[in-house]
C-alpha cells in the first residue's frame, strides 16, 4: 500500500502546527467535492469512477479485442489527457524489450511530419487498427493524424473492412468526431461529459488501450477503488492524499518554492511522470498561481540536473516516488581477482543499489536545502498503478482548491489555439 513520508520537510516547515491550522479548511473542501451536485455534474465525473466502474463496458472492449486476434498494432490517436494516461499505464506495467501483440503506438500527440511519416512506413507490413480519442474532434494534432491514418487504413483494407478497424472514443452527444463516427459506422466509446482529459485514465480513454495491451484492468480498478476509500476521509490526519496536497501548498506559499520535481528511479515511470505533469500543471497553473512541475528520472538525471538541484537556486522541492521491490532484477556477480574494483557491491541486486542511491540523494538534497516528500509503493503492478493514479487525482483536486482556483478547467490552452487557427487560415 502507498505510504507518504513527510520527514524530509520537517526542517523547513512546522508541519504539525500548519496541519492543525488547515485541517478545518480541508474538511470544508472535501465536503464540497463530494456534496456539491452542480460541481460534480460539471467537472467531477472522475471522482466516483472506481465506485461505479462499468464492467459490462469492459467486457464489450474485451470482445472487440478478441475479434481482432491477429492484430499487430493498435495506433492510439490523441493528445494531452487523451493519450498520456494510456501511455503511462502501459509503460508502468510492460517492458520495452518484450513485444506483446498488439503493440500500442501513439500518434496525434505532436505535429511532427517526420514522426508520422515513419509511423506510416512502420505500419506498411503490419496488421493494424486505430483508436482515435477526442471529445470534440477538432483538436488539431489528433484530427490531422486521424485524417492521414484513416486514408492509409482505407487504402490498405478498403473502406468497408477499414471501418471495423477504427474505434472512436468521444463525446456521447455532440462533436465533429461523433458525427463522423456515426456517418461512417465506427465502433464508439464514450468520454463522460463531466470528466476532463487529465482525469480520464479510468474511462474508455485509458481502459480501451489497456485492454488491447493485455493489462489487468480489474486489478487496476481494485487499486483505484481502494484509493477512493482511503482518500474519502475528510480528516486530514487520516488522508495521505490531502497531506501531500497541503505539504506542496505550504512549500509553495510559506517557503516560496516555485517548482516541484517528481523524482523517480525506474524508467517504467517516465511516462507516468508526463501524465502527472499535465495533471498538476493544467489544474493549477492559472490566475498567475501554481507551482511549475517537472520530473527527473534517476540515477540518469543525477548526472545532468543533479548539480543544479544540489547547489543551484533554491526554487524547488522534490516528491520522490520510491518503488521498494522490483519483480525483474539483476544481481552483481563476484569476480575473483577483480580489475574493475566493484566487488564491494558483489551479491547485491540492482534494486538494493538503486535504494542506496535514492537514500543518499534524498539525504544530500535535504542537507542542500531542498525539501523532500516521499511516496512509497511496494511494486509496479496494475493494482498500484490504479491506486497511485487516483491518489494523485484526488490530491490535485485538493491542492488546486487550496490555491483558490478551479482545478478542473483550462481556459489558458485556448489562447494559443485561437492564434494558431488565425495564422493557419490566413
Swiss-Prot record:
Gene3D superfamilies: Glucose-6-phosphate isomerase like protein, domain 1 (3.40.50.10490). Pfam families: PGI (PF00342). Its EC number is 5.3.1.9. It is found in: Cytoplasm. The keyword Cytoplasm applies. It comes from the Bacteria. The active site is at residues 282, 303, 417. Keywords: Cytoplasm, Gluconeogenesis, Glycolysis, Isomerase. Belongs to the GPI family. NCBIfam families: PRK14097.1. This is Glucose-6-phosphate isomerase. It comes from Onion yellows phytoplasma (strain OY-M).
Amino acid at each position: 500500500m502507498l505510504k507518504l513520508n513527510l520527514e524530509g520537510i520537517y526542517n523547513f516547515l512546522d508541519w504539525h502546527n500548519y496541519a492543525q491550522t488547515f485541517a478545518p479548511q480541508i474538511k470544508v473542501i472535501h465536503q464540497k467535492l463530494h456534496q456539491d451536485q452542480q460541481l460534480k455534474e460539471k467537472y467531477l465525473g472522475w471522482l466516483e469512477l472506481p465506485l461505479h466502474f462499468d464492467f459490462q463496458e469492459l467486457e464489450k472492449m474485451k470482445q472487440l479485442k478478441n475479434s481482432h486476434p491477429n492484430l499487430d498494432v493498435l495506433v492510439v490517436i490523441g493528445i494531452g489527457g487523451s493519450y498520456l494516461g494510456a501511455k503511462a499505464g502501459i509503460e508502468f506495467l510492460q517492458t520495452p524489450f518484450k513485444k506483446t501483440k498488439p503493440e500500442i503506438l501513439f500518434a496525434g500527440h505532436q505535429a511532427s511530419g517526420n514522426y508520422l511519416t515513419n509511423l506510416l512506413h512502420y505500419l506498411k507490413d503490419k496488421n493494424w487498427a486505430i483508436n482515435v480519442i477526442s471529445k470534440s474532434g477538432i483538436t488539431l494534432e489528433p484530427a490531422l493524424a486521424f485524417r492521414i491514418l484513416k486514408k492509409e487504413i482505407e487504402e490498405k483494407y478498403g473502406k468497408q473492412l477499414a471501418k471495423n478497424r477504427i474505434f472512436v472514443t468521444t463525446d456521447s452527444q455532440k462533436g465533429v468526431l461523433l458525427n463522423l463516427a456515426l456517418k461512417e459506422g465506427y465502433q464508439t466509446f464514450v468520454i463522460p461529459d463531466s470528466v476532463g482529459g487529465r482525469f480520464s485514465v479510468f474511462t474508455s480513454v485509458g481502459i480501451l488501450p489497456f485492454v488491447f495491451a493485455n493489462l489487468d484492468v480489474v486489478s487496476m480498478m481494485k487499486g483505484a477503488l481502494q484509493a477512493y476509500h482511503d482518500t474519502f476521509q475528510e480528516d486530514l490526519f487520516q488522508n495521505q492524499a490531502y497531506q501531500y496536497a497541503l505539504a506542496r501548498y505550504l512549500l509553495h506559499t510559506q517557503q516560496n518554492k516555485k517548482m516541484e520535481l517528481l523524482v523517480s528511479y525506474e524508467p517504467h515511470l517516465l511516462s507516468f511522470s508526463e501524465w502527472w505533469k499535465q495533471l498538476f500543471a493544467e489544474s493549477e497553473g492559472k490566475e498567475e498561481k501554481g507551482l511549475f512541475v517537472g520530473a527527473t528520472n534517476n540515477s540518469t538525471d543525477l548526472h545532468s540536473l543533479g548539480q543544479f538541484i544540489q547547489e543551484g537556486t533554491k526554487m524547488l522541492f522534490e516528491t520522490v516516488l520510491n518503488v521498494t521491490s522490483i519483480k525483474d532484477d539483476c544481481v552483481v556477480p563476484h569476480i575473483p581477482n577483480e580489475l574493475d574494483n566493484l566487488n564491494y557491491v558483489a551479491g547485491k541486486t540492482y534494486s538494493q543499489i538503486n535504494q542506496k542511491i535514492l537514500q543518499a540523494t534524498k539525504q544530500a538534497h535535504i542537507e542542500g536545502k531542498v525539501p523532500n516528500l516521499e511516496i512509497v509503493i511496494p511494486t509496479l503492478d496494475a493494482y498500484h498503478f490504479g491506486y497511485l493514479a487516483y491518489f494523485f487525482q484526488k490530491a490535485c483536486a485538493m491542492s488546486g482548491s487550496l490555491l483558490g482556483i478551479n482545478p478542473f478547467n483550462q481556459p489558458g490552452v485556448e489562447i494559443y489555439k485561437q492564434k494558431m487557427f488565425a495564422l493557419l487560415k490566413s
